[in-house]
């Protein structure tokens, strides 16, 4: 009986670790809630692509540093970063926001974040970009965003909203 209990407990723990290992972890901290008085974002990027790189870009209104897959030689998909205006963005995949949606377009979050880093200086700029971005978006994500004005927010985004 003790062996069976130990085996079941071990399997339960290992199952929990497996699930946890594939969960993306993020945090958005507003300036008023941080010891330094500055907003912060944090992301543990869980991805099947284990080789990542930071790249400097000068292809937009603002220069920016972006996290890319190392094999993305053109830097088309940026998976988080910060620009020269003090705007920063990252995402956490949200697999349940497009349930029942038959749209085939998906995995466009990196393209969207690249555009946001190129063009946005504030949360208001990002909200305008979200309003005007073509739909369906090909996105299933929570975007964590901060700006130089002390703004900090999460945005839940799917193909249509």
Q: What feature does the model see in each segment?
A:
Residues 9-17:
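Bacterial N-terminal signal peptides
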Residues 33-35, 121-161:
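Accessory structured domains or lobes within enzymes
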Residues 4, 17, 61-63:
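Intrinsically disordered, low-complexity N-terminal regions enriched in serine/proline/glycine
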Residues 1-8:
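Bacterial N-terminal signal peptides that target proteins for export
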Residues 23-108, 132, 136-140:
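A contiguous strand-loop segment
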Residues 8-9, 66:
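Composition-driven detection of intrinsically disordered, low-complexity segments
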């Amino acid at each position: 009986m003790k062996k069976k209990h130990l085996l079941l407990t071990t399997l339960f723990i290992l199952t929990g670790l497996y699930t946890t290992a594939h969960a993306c972890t993020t945090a958005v901290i507003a300036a008023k809630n941080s010891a330094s008085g500055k907003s912060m974002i944090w992301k543990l990027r869980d991805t099947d692509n284990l080789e990542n790189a930071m790249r400097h870009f000068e292809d937009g209104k603002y220069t920016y540093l972006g996290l890319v897959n190392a094999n993305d030689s053109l830097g088309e998909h940026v998976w988080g970063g910060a620009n020269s205006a003090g705007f920063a963005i990252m995402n956490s995949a949200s697999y349940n926001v497009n349930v029942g949606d038959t749209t085939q377009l998906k995995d466009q979050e990196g393209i969207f974040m690249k555009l946001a880093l190129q063009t946005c200086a504030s949360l208001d700029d990002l909200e305008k970009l979200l309003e005007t971005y073509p739909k369906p978006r090909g996105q299933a994500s929570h975007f964590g965003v901060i700006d130089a004005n002390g703004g900090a927010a999460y945005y839940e985004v799917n193909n249509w909203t």
